Structures are given as structure tokens and as C-alpha cells.
Amino acid sequence: MSLLDFSMYSIYARIRFKELRFTTKVSMSEIKSILSFTGWNVFGSFAYMLKNQGSAIVLNSFFGTAINAAFGISNQVMAAIKNFSINLITAFRPQLVEAYARGDYSRTTKMFYSMTKVTYIFLFAISLPLICEIEQVLKIWLGDYPDYAVSLTVLSIICMLFSNLNTPVAQMVLAIGKLKEFQIVTSLLICMIIPLSWICFHYGLNPNWIYIVSIIIVIVNQIANLIILRKIYNFEYFEYLKDAIMPCLYATILSPIV
């Protein structure tokens, strides 16, 4: 199946992009660039895996298996909602990459802002009723559910919404191809969740702080990643706030009222 996918993509690329040519020549600089790109992607994925596994271990060591089960439930709900975001990002990504590759930076910036607000508003529209009725949803799904399952699930959804704002930034960095600084900063910040949560639990705070710490780190990471993106791509912070973040803020404030 993978071979078929590769073949279809190759045929499409050959037809769509006339400048592409098959060649037997090996360019070491190109291979080095591809390996670097892949390596930093793997590095970032490893950091997220470490964060997820480490969080479960820390929770289990302080609060036992019941809270760990509640944490697992919250992760399942968050992953289910996040799948919708992945589908939307998949629809945006080819257009974003194509616009940047062609040097159409005006369209690239518009796609960046559109991806930010569309994915957030769509996810928020799904998340809001779920947050409001989470007890009923868990009761239908599980019957009896562990302590802290409700609060952990709500906080996981909120964390996912904040984290989703960073996904378009990541897609921009991927389109540009300069991943090193982005992945190092993101990975270090994400991994900080584990020791900071451990400190919170050591001083007697409840399990909800695993996600409260995560939300704080996600916000800090968003700011850091915007600074990194600004170094490699020309966009204005004010324009980003006005065209991407403010529509998300309006949707968040007005939706519960409506």
C-alpha cells in the first residue's frame, strides 16, 4: 500500500510540476538536508512521547492507578477531538507549501492566518458542548468513571485548544524547512512539563495540575515559536493577532453567550 501511495504521488508530482526530472545522480547536500529534516521531526516526536509517558508515570507514582486511568480517559477524548484538527490541517497543508515554494508570500501568510482561525473555531465548536456535558458523556461512555476524570478531561480539551494554535506555526516552519531551533525549543519546553508537575505534586497540589502546567507551557511555547518563525519568515505580530487570534478570541467569548 505504501509503495502504491508513493507511486501515485510520484506520478502526480511529475505531471503537476513540469520542472521535476528523474535522475540517477546523487546529491549529498540534498541527502543531508533530507536527513536533517527527518531527524528533527523524529526528535520532536520523541519529546512528545516522553512527555506523555512521563506524565503517566508521575501521576501513577503520586496518586495511583485510579488517577492514571482518569488521565488515560482524558487523553482519549483529547485525541478523538484532535483528529478533526488533523483532517483540517491536511486540507490546508498542500496549499500552504505550494504557495511558499512558488514565492507567493502574501498567499502563504493568508493561508497561515486562515489555518489558525478555521481550525481553532472548528475545534472550539466541537469542544464547547462536550465541555458543558462532559459528566453525561462520561456516564454514557463508561458508566462509573474515576475521580478527577471530569476535571482532567475538561482541562485536556482546553490544553488541546491552546496547543492547536501552535499547529499552524509548526506547519509554517515545516514548509520553510528550518526545523532545528523550533524543535529544540519546543521539545525542551514540552519535556519541562514532567519535572514541573512533579514539583507541584510534591507540594501537595491535586492531579489537575498536570494539565494546568501543560497549558502554561503551551502558551509559553506558542510565544517562543512565533519569535522563531519571525526570524525565518516575514510576518507582523500585530497582523497575526488581528487576523488570526482575535477571531478565535471572539468565538471563545461569544459562543457561550449565544
Predicted regions mapped to residue ranges:
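Alpha-helical transmembrane segments of polytopic membrane transporters and translocases
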Residues: 4, 39-42, 55-57, 69-89, ...
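Hydrophobic alpha-helical transmembrane segments
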Residues: 1-16, 37, 187-192, 206-228, ...
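Interfacial segments at transmembrane-helix termini and the short loops linking adjacent helices
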Residues: 113, 121, 131-161, 233
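Membrane-interface "helix-start" segments
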Residues: 29-40, 119, 152, 214-258
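Interfacial/gating helices of multi-pass transporter permease domains
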Residues: 30-41, 58-79, 103, 107-111, ...
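Interhelical loop/hinge segments that connect adjacent transmembrane helices in multipass membrane
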Residues: 7-52, 91, 95-110, 231-246
